């Protein structure tokens, strides 16, 4: 039995233009189990989205910020990300999105060799990773993922992660899918995400999310 649903926002609850899908809002509001928003977006954005969805629990900044019933925990170290960006800028033609609202990671504009940049950071022995969310590249603390964030929320709720469904579209969602009891992917998901999923929706974006919830209901999971 599934006791909670963890779901990514961009690309999963939105359309292709990152506009929230009305059908996903309706589906979430009708769910009778707790919903956990798990995203790479900022804390302030995720908090606003939680209000729109009527959700009390979320993980923001790819696991760096956890909030449950307005109790916020910051677990990432922004200074390490700033140091990594300084080194990368000296060697690669990169630019970051300036956001004073980010607490634990940095966001880079796409268009550079991510694999080469990752290897360079490895050579410097900096405990950070580059993560592609499908919309941007994030510099984040190593060991902090959507999976670690979901685990913290599950502990607060007293719900084992194997009783939580995890739904997403990008590789950054895989860590939370791997620890969940029912990993699922929307139709527009990256191939690696589909491979990690137990169920892959035929439909994309918010419509795909609705399809997954319908499947879970039909199977008696929720």
Swiss-Prot record:
**Mind listing the UniProt keywords for this protein, alphabetically?**
Carbohydrate metabolism, Hydrolase, Magnesium, Metal-binding
Q: Which residues form the active site?
A: 8
**What EC class does the entry list?**
hydrolase
Specify which residues bind Mg(2+) according to the UniProt entry for this protein: 8, 10, 169, 173
Positions of substrate binding: 146
Which cofactors are named for this entry? Answer: Mg(2+)
The record's catalysed reaction(s) read:
2-phosphoglycolate + H2O = glycolate + phosphate
- Which residue pairs form cystines in this protein? none
EC number(s) given by UniProt: 3.1.3.18
This protein's record includes keyword Glycoprotein:
no
Q: Entry's Pfam families?
A: Hydrolase_3
Q: Which InterPro entries match?
A: HAD-like_sf (IPR036412), HAD_sf (IPR023214), PGPase (IPR006382)
Among the entry's GO cellular component annotations, what is one? cytosol
One GO MF term: phosphoglycolate phosphatase activity
Function, as annotated, reads: Catalyzes the dephosphorylation of 2-phosphoglycolate.
The UniProt similarity line reads: Belongs to the archaeal SPP-like hydrolase family.
Q: What is this protein's record name?
A: Phosphoglycolate phosphatase
Q: Which organism is it from?
A: Methanothrix thermoacetophila (strain DSM 6194 / JCM 14653 / NBRC 101360 / PT) (Methanosaeta thermophila)
